[in-house]
């Protein structure tokens, strides 16, 4: 059973190949994700991952961790992209259960999510809600 304070953590190293592959698969051809020369001349100073890339890693952690308790689906997420993720970054993905609202056929679970880089800088925050189902 999911409990308030339950935490899910995962650490992931991000490579240039990861960034290019994800951007290509989702047809995001923004040169910030593909062209080192172009990206170097921008305020970012080099290649960066697209926001959905590292958000999807966080969502994958949510799904794989909390489905250990039974079926669940995401129902609402508010996301803040704060800093870029770059090739060579090692990011920590984290979810913490903050509230559980009982319903007749399950629960609505509220969670705080975050991603920090190897320097301890927060690169993404989110508040999400999932619906769990009684089995």
Segments and roles (model prediction):
Residues 42-46, 55-96:
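Hydrophobic beta-strand-centered segment that forms part of the acyl-chain substrate-binding groove
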Residues 9-13, 80, 129-131:
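Generic structural detector for well-ordered beta-strands
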Residues 17, 39-40, 45, 82, ...:
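N-terminal hydrophobic or amphipathic segments with adjacent small-residue motifs
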Residues 2-7, 85-135:
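HotDog/MaoC-like acyl-thioester-processing domains
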Residues 1-49:
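Catalytic strand-loop segment that frames the active site of acyl-thioester-processing enzymes
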């Amino acid at each position: 059973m999911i409990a308030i304070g339950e935490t899910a953590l995962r650490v992931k190293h991000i490579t240039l190949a990861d960034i290019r592959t994800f951007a290509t698969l989702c047809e995001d051809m923004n040169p910030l994700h593909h062209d080192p020369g172009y990206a170097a001349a921008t305020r970012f100073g080099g290649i960066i991952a697209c926001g959905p890339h590292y958000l999807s890693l966080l969502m994958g952690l949510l799904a794989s961790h909390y489905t250990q308790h039974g079926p669940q689906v995401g129902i609402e997420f508010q996301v803040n992209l704060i800093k870029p993720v770059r090739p060579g970054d090692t990011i920590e993905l984290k979810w913490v259960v903050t509230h559980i609202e009982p319903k007749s056929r399950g629960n609505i679970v509220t969670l705080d999510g975050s991603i920090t880089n190897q320097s301890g800088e927060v690169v993404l925050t989110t508040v999400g809600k999932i619906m769990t189902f009684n089995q």
